């Protein structure tokens, strides 16, 4: 059971891969009377503090809500991939000039989860605008919750959504058979020649990422009280619900931009077919500044009886990667069903037929308008067929902070000729160094940087970047710049602790790697574990991934595949999607961790480059290679044995010697580090070079022997005299 509400990606076998992609237009059929609420109940969510065995993993929140005659405990956690961190919102001036603003969207106020003791429940909340707003689905019933504005006691209203099927009569699709045939004939030839079907072995991936742009027409804007902030809040709510519906397909729906037609519609709204056609042409030019996978238009038009329309399998194929969703003014959860349905068409899904099933009375791609939250086996098959053939734009997770960033004064990023950029008006009012026009205030020398303090350059020799480990090196300010020198570290291949070698600022070894995953008592497993597991070529043991194939490790490279551990005392608490494996080999229990295709998170189980794999050998790119492959232009002799080579092959001198070659007296550092401070005192090298270690050891042993010799005769004599 998904105890903590973790959404399980249902894997449905794709029975048939069709050649070509059928493209047509599919209308979400005509609506009947609008949905109605029951009378709302007033509830006050109370935070639940879990302790002991009932405590949730970090990141989970729990609230108790009493409605419908009983108490419900909601468990939820933050969604991280939903809205771009700097969301571009486009509106229009009175003279129809386009304005762009970038909202800073908090990444900790969109939640999803479940209701305790309610199997198949769903919770989708936002808390960005004061209180909880969203949807709860419990035992086949749907509820919407919203905060009571300005309530001093955190009061909310909970509405039960009527789900009587008589309110949802059969709906007619907007296409005739003749139109379907025409669309198929028009697009089939070009599509078949353009597509290159992918391997059937790649039909399941861990995650897809659909970057969505939403355009809101003027009637929708009027319905949202002609308030741009209210429009944004409504759009966020709908996308949040839709995203939760698509989790079962392993798909993230990520909002990357909104355009609001606040001054009137850009083109007429006469029929749903005309709106879709005009929208697909308009967006090709007007949304070109936003790289997106799909664009959907939210309209509100009671004169258009069709709820939605989209090009089937238009994903990744501009300009037909779009759809239109018609809000009927009923409930946001039902409108989210419409959006999920039309987005399903964009992703290649057809309407469900008699042999399609999802385990519920109503399914998302049903031709009947009923509350639904699941896709059928037919929808899975259509989705996988489309994404296999043309879903390349869905493969890569977006960098949410970099989706859209106009270069301009006021975006908080120093660009071009700007001296500084303090961001918004409110931020600039609190900035002592930077003005609103991106110039420095009078008397200020700087406004940011590791070597800027109180609008002044920090003095020469001031430490600005402390070394973080034995393979790192410090940097100091030069007194004339706000920037700390570029981060430098010890040259690759220089020995570090535990008979390891520094590599790219790290001192890696298998034992330490095992301790990081399994705790302080764990250690690297025997050679038999590495040979047996890493030669299998599966997600628990391999030497890399080529496309969709796990590569078996050659016998000489088994220590460079996946780390294998033993002496494991505790099972670690890991991120979602990781799986632990323990295998008994020759009386030893070998522990490892998996990594499968397109997890899109850091692989903590792969052996890190630079890890020792044999005498004088290290792992690089899953191969066990000789240390000689590393370029050692700089040697200890280069630094006169008084310093260490850095990653630029320059000498970083010990205290008492000056760069570049540590020949003359000075305060240490390198030509890259900035001038070292004269106040550091005695220099203690970060790297224990073996020769120095031996000298230290011999000195210590000699000293002990000397002391023992000095004290020995006295003890012997005293013992003899007794």
Swiss-Prot record:
It comes from Homo sapiens. This is Disintegrin and metalloproteinase domain-containing protein 21. Residues 703-722 are cytoplasmic. Residues 208-398 form the Peptidase M12B domain. Its main location: membrane. May be the functional equivalent of ADAM 1/fertilin alpha which is a pseudogene in human. Coiled coil: none annotated. The lineage of its organism: Eukaryota, Metazoa, Chordata, Craniata, Vertebrata. CDD domains: ZnMc_adamalysin_II_like. Its EC number is 3.4.24.-.
